[in-house]
Amino acid sequence: MHDAVRRAGVESEEELDAGALARVAEDCRAMLAEEDALPPENARAQIATALAAMAQAWSGPGGQARRAARGGEASAGLAVIVQVMALGLGGGAEALAGAGVAGFRSETTGERRLAGRFLAEAQGEEALMGLRTPLLLTVSERLAEGQRQPSLEERAPAVTEALAAAGRRLEDKLAEDFALDFTLEAGRLQITELRPAKQSARAAVRLATDLATRGAITRADALRRIDPSALEAHLHPTIDESAPRDLIGQGLPASPGAASGPLVFTPEAAEVAAAGGNAAILALVETSPEDIRGMHAALGVVTVRGGMTSHAAVVARGLGKPCVVGAKTLRLSKREPALLTAEGRRFEEGDIVTVDGGSGQVIAGAVETRAPELTGAFARLMGWADETRRLGVRANADTGADARVAAGFEAAGIGLCRTEHMFFQGGRITPMRRMILAGNGEDRRAALDELHPMQRSDFTELFRAMPGLPVVIRLLDPPLHEFLPHGQAEIAELGRTLGLGEDEVLMRARELAEFNPMLGKRGCRVGIAYPEIYEMQVRAILEAAIDAREEDGQPVVPEIMIPLVSAVRELALLRERIDSVAEAVRAERETMVDYSVGVMLETPRACLRAGEIARLADFISFGTNDLTQMTYGLSRDDAGRFMPDYVTQGIYEHDPFHSLDHDGVGELMQIAAERARAVKPDISVGLCGEQGADPSSVEFCERAGFDYVSCSPYRVPIARFAAAQAAIGRSSDL
């Protein structure tokens, strides 16, 4: 065709006369004859040949591979529609002929608008093949793209009006967004094919709310058709889908959102960068609890190791920071700080990279992002979700800032405050370490006296952010050695700060070291061994609650949670001490707040003895991270190294740290809830592990009749939405 255009001395194939086109047809026939590929002259034989070719392509390796990639069955049959064609040829001055494609909503925002392409004297999808420059459908499209030739709207306004009207009717009938192929034959519009349109999460929300508002679907249908995880796009900045990406690494999408900034390789460097007004992307092999300040200061986090429930992933989700973990195609240079790619590219401190926590991609340079949007269609849909759900949704929040974010996302309180995270902030780690290294109770109490006002101030912020709502504060949980430095230089510096010899610090650190610390002296065992620690925390909680109530005039609901209980005698001993501290505070302040004492059920034994525990507990909350570890015998921090293989080979249906195991861990939880409620029917039952916003886990909690789930602040809307879907599913099963 290009040769024919050149020979005729014209600019496009539209200008070729009948003789030139006849010569093109003869040339094509000759080429096909040489290949012994001439099509049959008989129409029925042509159809049979076409069907045979389609069947061959469908059953071939390529067709099977494409079906497998989309979750289809390799042996699935082929359905073919044979229909009369509208050719899109034979137009003239009076009427256009040709073919085009049209869409009726923005792929990105879901806003209703007509857009597409039209190619004169064409058939099928030729308008998208780039053989000639097509007309844009509307004036607004033409102006936006700077195209000079008139749009179809300008050449044939009646056609675009008919297209828009057809789109509206079909959307109401199908209750879906779609794209269509159309043909103009002597000016007559014919729709030849419909197919589902590509949609962003924002567009899906807009369509669902529009349809429900117009009555085309019910509100329940609107809630059912949205994937809760797709709501992440509304809660965090996301990368502009049309922006080019220079991909340098791929990992797991541990925490959604996107951020661009200069690379740094230590938590300290991240803090310095943030203090200088140039917050950075923190890249580490993996993170530990002492890195939390650097993670808080960073725009985003990348780790070479780790899984979806690794320390980096959990903390980043709680902070609302984009995070990619397990980026195995990247490595960190040990000689000098640098990030190295599998292709040999090198990125040094200060080089700009982008972290896309939604896709797990690490990208060179800065990439344009879209701001989150919590109004309009999203807000309307969330309102419907809240009207529908039964299950309460609280937030895991460790600071006043976290609690305020959670309140903004309409959390019904705090389901878990991890007090240990507070000790890594500001100048608190030094008195905490002084307390740990103290050789006697008197020195330990002196250090705790220094920490007490800090804890009280923190708790006051939490109560003020959640007036009248429950605030569950977990007493100190991790083993004490986690708060001590590991490097020789840091140990020496700590010794100088505390006036201790380096050998003395090392000796005490060795005394605290354990072979299996996650099953060692942690949780309530720390509170029993060092009662002054829990006594300080309980006093700070109750004093903070009184302060918040008196200063703000708002009700407060403190709930004190004891971690890692496995024997009822542990609870009895600690509850007695908590009540004793409360009486002392009452005597000093001449007032008291109503408080609850509960247990974090994290061991299989605690689940089995939940009836006994319920006699002394006001509430129970399942810590599914540790409960999953102990039920499976898996280390959450190490499981990421083999979990993908287990899931791929079908040993596990999914990562049990990411989505609750209904059959094993879930059965223990149901046993515990039933035994607890048999003793105390009104006992509150919740879940506060990482699975708190996972839709499948939320559905389990709804079916089990739990009272609430708790998740990171930025996932509260997802849990609220999943709870609504679970309520709809449960009601439809009744």
Please place each PLM-identified region on the residue numbering.
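Flexible glycine-/small-residue-rich
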Residues: L184, P196, L284, V355-G357, ...
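Protease-associated
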Residues: A216-A297, Q361-V367, F378, M382-D386, ...
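A glycine- and small-aliphatic-rich helix-loop capping segment at beta-alpha/alpha-beta transitions
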Residues: L299-T303, L319-G326, I491, D637-G640, ...
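Glycine-rich phosphate/ribose-binding loops and adjacent secondary-structure elements
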Residues: R188-Q190, S288-H296, V302, M308-V315, ...
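Conserved alpha/beta-domain cores
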Residues: L374-A377, W384-L734
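C-terminal domain-closing interface element
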Residues: F182, E348-N396, D402
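Structural motif
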Residues: I81, V264, I281-L284, V302, ...
